[in-house]
UniProtKB/Swiss-Prot annotation:
Superkingdom to which the source organism belongs: Bacteria
Family classification: Belongs to the mannitol dehydrogenase family. UxaB subfamily.
Protein name: Altronate oxidoreductase
GO cellular component: cytosol
Entry annotated with the keyword NAD: yes
């Protein structure tokens, strides 16, 4: 069986216009996949140079396959049908190592055609490293490496205004573009680089914050033989991902034209502020996950897919989203409804087995950040507690009992909550506290909730009633009126 290379699999080789820091599965199934589509259907004509930003030779370089690899996109399409689509990605020209090929790395700045810089160097990648110096070959941190590369470009082109870059980080931190820009400016200042360089950084370059959304499941280890047989070639860089994707870029509107998004309408939004889109994702996608987990698990289910194929639990989740989460969010209703429909479809993806217990990790913090804002906003707007989000809080407290049908299961949270719940449920079992006292103890933890939730009118009483129903009637019976 042949291995992918450009001799045996000839095709277009695009001029290098994109630098990408990061060789991992996510960028290959997200950025490079989109660039490949744009190259095929528009005149973007952009080749990608992947820069490996760390000192590691594992996995092997993409250059061993001349940059070629296959994506397999799997999930439910817009019609709810299970689909699996393979695509040979040709957008990556080569990979270089910033550690083994530092001179080659700096030479990228001399290419007049380079216009875009994408990155995913993990959440810790956009950070300050005190020891980084201008003459390091290379510096340790990604922002320092980028600063050195930008200065190389500034120097080579004598500060030409038309040689700046559009810098689009994909790291999962809030306002990643602004954070990266601040660090680049910090290094420029600490390294005493010319004031003209700082001016050029500000005037000729655009740092864009982003929100990225796609579940990338990566190399399909258990299915490789079967997939390669159907493809007809060996591919050491096979990359699998879900059907859904969303790319929100906070940047100038001319960016849509530069990326040729006016010619191929991908699911990419160029917006003035990513904040409402971040809030939408956290509230609907992450919030629904967090509400679902304790309810579904205590109802006897083990995966998200099982839960969404269960009529009762699915109805609970959908009504929580549409009746209690969406009404308090600050985006057009039709956009929120469309996103919510996509979320439900993603939860049903038969190709992804999401274990409820793995999503349950740090559930107390997740509830505070993902659900509590909508619960409190709903109570403030409507004057009544949103019943499903309130029930989800009761279910969460029941979940931290650590027992389902007489059997234990592992709980994963910070040590404070694990110890506190063990103490409270032991006291309840000994009848030394009432159920209401247990609920009050949880809701009054101001250090965690950043407020005393027993002060929210009716909340402690309703959580106690819901918790009593879960414990005495079972989850199925307790949740039924809310489905």
């Amino acid at each position: 069986m042949k291995t992918l290379n450009r001799r045996d699999f000839p095709g277009a080789l695009w001029p290098e216009r994109i630098i990408q820091f990061g060789e991992g599965n996510f960028l290959r199934a997200f950025i490079d996949w989109q660039v490949d589509l744009l190259n095929e259907h528009t005149d973007l004509n952009a080749g990608v140079v992947v820069v490996r930003p760390i000192a590691s030779d594992f996995p092997p370089s993409l250059s061993t396959q001349d940059g070629l690899y296959t994506t397999i996109i799997r999930g439910l399409n817009e019609k709810g049908e299970a689909v699996s689509e393979s695509r040979l990605i040709r957008s990556v020209n080569r990979e270089i190592s910033v550690y083994a090929q530092y001179d080659e790395f700096l030479k990228l700045a001399h290419n007049p055609d380079i216009r875009f810089v994408f990155s995913n160097t993990t959440e810790a990648g956009i950070s300050y490293h005190a020891g980084d110096q201008f003459d390091d070959a290379p510096a340790v941190s990604y922002p320092a490496k980028l600063t050195r590369l930008l200065f190389e470009r500034f120097s080579h082109f004598d500060g030409a205004q038309d040689k700046g870059w559009v810098i689009i980080p994909c790291e999962l931190i809030d306002y990643n573009g602004e954070a990266l820009r601040e660090l680049v400016l910090r290094y420029a200042h600490e390294w005493a680089l010319p004031a003209a360089f700082t001016t050029w950084l500000e005037s000729a370059n655009s740092f864009c914050s982003t929100l990225v959304d796609r579940i990338v499941t990566g190399y399909p280890r258990d299915e490789v033989a079967q997939l390669e047989e159907s493809l007809g070639y060996h591919d050491a860089f096979l990359d699998t991902a879900e059907h859904f994707y969303l790319f929100v870029i906070q940047g100038p509107q001319w960016l849509a034209r530069e990326l040729r998004l006016d010619k191929l309408p991908l699911n990419v939004l160029i917006v003035d502020d990513i904040k409402p889109y971040k809030a939408r994702k956290v509230a609907i996608l992450n919030g629904a996950h967090t509400a679902l987990v304790p309810v579904a698990f205590l109802a006897g289910l083990n995966t998200v897919g099982e839960a969404m194929n269960d009529a009762q639990i699915c109805a609970f989740v959908e009504r929580a989203i549409h009746d209690e989460i969406i009404p308090v969010l600050d985006l057009p209703r039709n956009e929120l409804e469309s996103f919510a429909d996509a979320v439900v479809s993603r939860f049903r993806n038969p190709y992804i087995k999401h274990q409820l217990l793995s999503i349950a990790l740090n559930g107390m913090t997740k509830f505070r950040t993902r659900i509590l804002p909508q619960l409190l906003a709903g109570q403030a707007q409507m004057g009544t507690l949103p019943p499903r989000l309130t029930f989800a809080l009761a279910a969460l407290i029941a979940f931290y009992r650590g027992e389902r049908n007489g059997e234990g299961y592992p709980l994963q949270d910070d040590a404070h909550w694990l110890a506190r719940f063990e103490q409270l449920w032991t006291q309840r079992g000994d009848n030394t506290i009432t159920l209401r006292e247990l609920v009050d103890a949880v809701l009054s933890d101001c250090e965690h909730w950043e407020q005393d939730l027993t002060a929210v009118p009716g909340l402690a009483a309703q959580v106690t009633r819901d918790l009593d129903a879960i414990l005495n009637q079972g989850m199925r019976h307790a949740v039924a009126p809310l489905c």
